[in-house]
From Swiss-Prot:
A UniProt-annotated Pfam family: TAL_FSA
Signal sequence coordinates: none
Gene3D superfamilies: Aldolase class I
EC numbers for this chain: 2.2.1.2
Chief location: cytoplasm
UniProt KW Repressor keyword: no
Cross-referenced InterPro entries: Aldolase_TIM, TAL/FSA, Transaldolase_3B, Transaldolase_3B/F6P_aldolase, Transaldolase_AS, TSA/FSA_arc/bac
Cellular component aspect of the GO annotation: cytoplasm
Keywords per UniProt: Cytoplasm, Pentose shunt, Schiff base, Transferase
Gene: tal
Example of a GO biological process term: carbohydrate metabolic process
Matches recorded under PROSITE patterns: TRANSALDOLASE_1
Protein name listed in UniProt: Probable transaldolase
Amino acid sequence: MKFFLDTANVEKIKEFNALGLVDGVTTNPSLIKKEGRDFYEVIKEICSIVDGPVSAEVIALDSEGMVKEARELVKLAENVVVKIPMTKEGMKAVNILSKEGIKTNVTLIFSANQALLAAKAGASYVSPFVGRLDDVGQDGMFLISEVMQVFGAYGIETEVIVASVRHPIHVLESAKMGADIATIPFDVLDKLFNHPLTDNGIAKFLSDWEAHMNR
């Protein structure tokens, strides 16, 4: 499974990229707003750091506006993927862009039907939001299992990005279900490193070594 970093924080991207853990990056207007920098400047810098896909989201709500923005975004770098919302206008834009060879990531997916529609429209990626479904009392990971089942049954090549990841269990369950990608906030990715028995083991090794050296 590929790991995308869900952030626009350039320093965090550099940190995890240096570990060989970043296969791509997803951003959205809210994440870029947190950085307090120019939208295009941030996307361009991220694309220069990461070799893999970098998702940048359009702001327009009409298909014509989305297509216009998308064509500008892909001029920034070869690895830009255009993020499009799951709406009728969005799917119209995806269909146009796919015919132009522009890769798209359809975001705000909350049902398998929506994922299927996006794939049929020509999306390169779909992003089901698991954490937000959990927030309203639904099982976010069940959606992933449904999407993987449908895509597998028909050999659909659109890749599934598990989004709105809130904790390490989301990542593990995504991997067990065979999801192509999990896009992970850096604080959640940090938690994947941790286990109390690892810490205890390191402490024991150091203690034993110090005791040995002090004999």
